[in-house]
């Protein structure tokens, strides 16, 4: 999955240089996926869906690490991931091995990708300029009864992320920070039933760089209270 964007730690963004072929660079993207594992595990501990035998869509899949985890540990039937970063997708295809995974370079669900049981993203919504269009696209990609789980910590009510966004939005070409209430309303308007919860996070890995920019309690508050798991269910 894309995008919390700080080199060398598990998720607090720092100013970065984005690449057309990778989110950051080959080495940094690989490190980012490893650093996100504790959040991925928390997502899987929190959701209320049995993934065994399901067809899964990963929105902003980067190098495919989350789908490999689902194939190895959750017994999914098929996994499909898309991402605009060309080289990251090439890596995802190579690393998939014989797993039932497919990856495409795209900024939206590719044509013909539909009928999914479950979709996921981790910190992708804040990057998108047109969330109503995204909500509609994912609604169409899911089968009736399908569920879209989206983790969102970069939003207007998160003090750490508001500070980071103010410093980096112009250089990164980011849209204005979204309010969670507005995000929920857009997905509701697209036809979803909306629910929200906090991630079941246990220990948070703390890199030394964290403490150069934020107090430990602020970092914990971000992960425990401000990083929200949104559930969008298609009736």
PLM regions with names:
Residues 162-163, 195-235:
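A C-terminal cap/extension of S-adenosyl-L-methionine-dependent methyltransferases
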Residues 132-144:
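A short glycine-rich, Lys/Arg-flanked "PGG" loop and its adjoining helix->strand segment in the class I
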Residues 123-127:
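Short catalytic micro-motifs in class I SAM-dependent methyltransferases
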Residues 120:
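A conserved beta-strand element that flanks and buttresses the S-adenosyl-L-methionine
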Residues 63-108:
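Class I SAM-dependent methyltransferase SAM/SAH-binding core
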Residues 175-191, 196-197:
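Short alpha-helix
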Residues 1-50, 69, 149-174:
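Conserved class I S-adenosyl-L-methionine
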């Amino acid at each position: 999955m894309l995008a919390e964007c700080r080199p060398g730690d598990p998720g607090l963004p720092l100013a970065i240089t984005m690449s057309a072929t990778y989110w950051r660079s080959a080495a940094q993207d690989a490190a980012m996926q490893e650093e996100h594992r504790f959040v991925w595990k928390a997502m899987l501990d929190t959701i209320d869906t049995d993934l065994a035998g399901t067809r899964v869509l990963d929105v902003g899949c980067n190098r495919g690490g989350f789908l490999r985890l689902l194939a190895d540990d959750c017994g999914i039937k098929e996994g499909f991931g898309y991402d605009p970063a060309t080289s990251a997708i090439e890596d995802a295809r190579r690393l998939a091995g014989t797993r039932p995974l497919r990856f495409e370079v795209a900024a939206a669900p590719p044509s013909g990708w539909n009928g999914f049981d479950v979709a996921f993203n981790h910190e992708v919504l804040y990057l998108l300029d047109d969330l109503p269009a995204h909500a509609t696209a994912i609604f169409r990609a899911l089968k009736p009864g399908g569920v879209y789980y989206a983790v969102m910590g970069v939003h207007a009510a998160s003090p750490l992320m508001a500070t980071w966004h103010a410093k980096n939005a112009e250089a990164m070409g980011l849209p204005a920070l979204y309010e969670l209430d507005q995000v929920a309303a857009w997905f509701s308007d697209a036809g979803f039933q909306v629910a929200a919860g906090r991630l079941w996070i246990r220990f948070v890995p703390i890199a030394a760089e964290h403490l150069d920019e934020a107090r430990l309690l602020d970092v914990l508050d971000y992960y425990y209270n401000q990083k929200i798991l949104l559930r969008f269910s298609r009736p």
